[in-house]
């Protein structure tokens, strides 16, 4: 039953995010915040598919243990695409609120992203095995969490200062995604049920994408 529920949920998630992303790309002008947001959604869905598709196959066939290599490779790819996702979200923030300058913030975003990706590439992660070291799981997620925190602060301040009702909860979607993700990193190997927190974490990302999509529909409608 768990395999069926999780597989159906993952398919729904991937189809939703990719469909919304493609619609945003097709329905927006080049160089706009919504074109960037659509690209961000496609990166999210495409990256997650490398992990979720093998996971669905594993759950519905011989089990996770038998799919160590494709699952590990999928997690590896997803760890990089999620970093790219937040870099794109940073540029959505810059475009939406017409931010100029802020070179120090941009440098911080790139520095944290670079450190995160370099750490993800280290062989000590043992991605292609069934047992990745907890210490490296924590280490590679420290710059990722700091990047997320930076994006949270930026959207919270800007949405409040600009009375941006469409994006007023963007910061919260990121808080929730990390709030559900961190316990999985720390304790999923000890208690596999904690891995179920990836479902509400995924829902938080769907909320993130829908915020952008709904804003595009509303703001495009006003222009027309």
Where are these regions (language model features)?
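Hydrophobic transmembrane alpha-helical segments in integral membrane proteins
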Residues: 1-19
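Internal transmembrane alpha-helix with an interfacial aromatic "cap," most often the third helix
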Residues: 21-27, 50-106, 120-122, 155, ...
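A cytosolic-side transmembrane-helix exit/cap motif
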Residues: 56-61, 129, 156-160, 188-194, ...
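Alpha-helical transmembrane segments of multi-pass integral membrane proteins
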Residues: 39-53, 74-91, 103-124, 139-151, ...
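Alpha-helical transmembrane segments in multipass membrane proteins, preferentially the mid-helix core
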Residues: 17-26, 87-93, 118-123, 142-168, ...
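Non-cytosolic membrane-interface motifs at loop->transmembrane helix junctions
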Residues: 3-6, 64-76, 129-142, 191-201
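Membrane-interface helix-boundary motifs at transmembrane edges
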Residues: 26-37, 93-105, 130-133, 156-168, ...
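Terminal transmembrane helical module of multi-pass membrane proteins
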Residues: 171-217
């Amino acid at each position: 039953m768990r395999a069926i529920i999780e597989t159906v949920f993952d398919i729904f998630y991937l189809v939703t995010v990719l469909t919304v992303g493609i619609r945003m790309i097709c329905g927006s002008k080049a160089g706009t915040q919504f074109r960037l947001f659509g690209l961000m959604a496609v990166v999210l869905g495409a990256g997650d598919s490398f992990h979720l598709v093998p996971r669905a196959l594993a759950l519905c066939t011989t089990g996770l243990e038998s799919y160590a290599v494709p699952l590990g490779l999928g997690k590896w790819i997803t760890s990089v695409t999620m970093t790219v996702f937040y870099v794109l979200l940073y540029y959505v923030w810059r475009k939406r609120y017409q931010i100029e300058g802020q070179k120090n913030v941009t440098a911080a975003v790139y520095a944290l992203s670079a450190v995160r990706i370099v750490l993800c590439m280290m062989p000590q992660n043992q991605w292609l095995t069934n047992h990745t070291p907890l210490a490296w799981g924590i280490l590679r997620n420290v710059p990722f969490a700091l990047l997320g925190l930076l994006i949270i602060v930026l959207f919270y301040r800007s949405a409040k200062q600009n009375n941006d009702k469409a994006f007023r909860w963007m910061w919260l979607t990121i808080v929730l995604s990390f709030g559900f993700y961190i316990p999985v990193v720390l304790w999923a190997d000890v208690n596999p049920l904690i891995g179920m927190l990836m479902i509400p974490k995924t829902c938080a990302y769907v909320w993130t994408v829908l915020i952008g999509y709904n804003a595009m529909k509303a703001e495009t409608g006003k222009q027309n």
